[in-house]
Regions:
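Flexible "arm" and connector segments at domain edges
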Residues: 1-58, 64-194, 198-263
Length: 263
């Protein structure tokens, strides 16, 4: 028995009405969904840490999510694991005509252009009337914003140079500050303007060839690393963070930054 069949058999036993696991038998598509998201992020974390032993395990956990959905779908007569494999195989062959068909592609740009053309044709066949119809609302907000912007760009709704993109960021900053300076701040309006500013910043990242979600993840990691070092230095001086003034913490923060630059 190959390992895929072994995994499928394990999943079937876990869901068996007679001898299965009580917890696994109670699960539904909706109840499993949060675990799928969690496992996806754990895969990304292992990749970021370049921990490939851990990555092997996390990919297994993610694969188990797919198998879980397949088992539940099979029980309801919707589809099974083979149908999932067939669907992705068909899609890959269809979207790579330069490999499995008669067309040619000279570089990655040719591939991506053709890929988007094929996706547009597929959306038309599904009676999707907007270029934005199949963008999942459950995507992380930065990722979804960038995907929306890319789809709009694919149909020509986009600036062709960086200048207007940067100008838009400054415009949105001005609008945020206008709301901040009101005698009575309208929090709903301020939130709206902050959203516009973040959206414009994501668009700037896209025009610069940067993935906003990844950039922010790295910024989070950098800030966390530096703050932990600030905590360590403050503790080494025999002090508590809550008892140190902001000026001292800023001094230590700058020291940590200089140490990183010198490495």
């Amino acid at each position: 028995m190959n390992q895929i069949d072994r995994l499928l058999n394990i999943m079937q036993r876990l869901r068996d009405p007679e001898g299965g696991c009580p917890w696994d038998k109670e699960q539904t598509f909706a109840s499993i969904a949060p675990y799928t998201l969690e496992e996806t992020y754990e895969v990304l974390d292992a990749i970021a840490r370049e921990d490939f032993d851990d990555l092997r395990g996390e990919l297994g956990d993610l694969l188990f999510q797919v198998v879980f959905y397949a088992q539940m779908a099979q029980e309801e007569g919707l589809f099974d694991f083979n149908d999932i494999c067939a669907a992705i195989s068909d899609k890959l062959e269809r979207r790579h005509p330069h490999v499995f068909g008669e067309l040619s592609a000279n570089n990655s740009e040719d591939v991506l252009v053709r890929w988007e053309q094929i996706k547009t044709e597929e959306r038309a066949q599904k009676a999707q009337h907007s270029a934005l119809d199949d963008i999942p609302r459950s995507l992380p907000a930065l990722m979804r914003a960038q995907k929306i912007q890319k789809r709009c760009s694919n149909v020509g709704f986009d600036w062709t140079t960086l200048g207007p993109v940067v100008d838009k960021v400054y415009e949105e900053i001005d609008e945020v500050m206008f709301e901040v300076r009101q005698a009575v701040v309208d929090q709903a309006k301020l939130e709206e303007e902050m959203g516009d500013l973040i959206f414009a910043t994501v668009n700037m990242a896209r025009h610069l060839g940067t993935k906003a979600e990844l950039a922010l993840q790295k910024a989070n990691d950098k800030f966390e690393r530096r703050f932990r070092e600030v905590e360590r230095i403050v503790a080494a001086r025999g002090l508590e963070m809550t008892g140190v003034d902001l000026e001292t913490m800023e001094e230590v923060w700058q020291e940590v930054k200089r140490q990183e630059i010198d490495l």
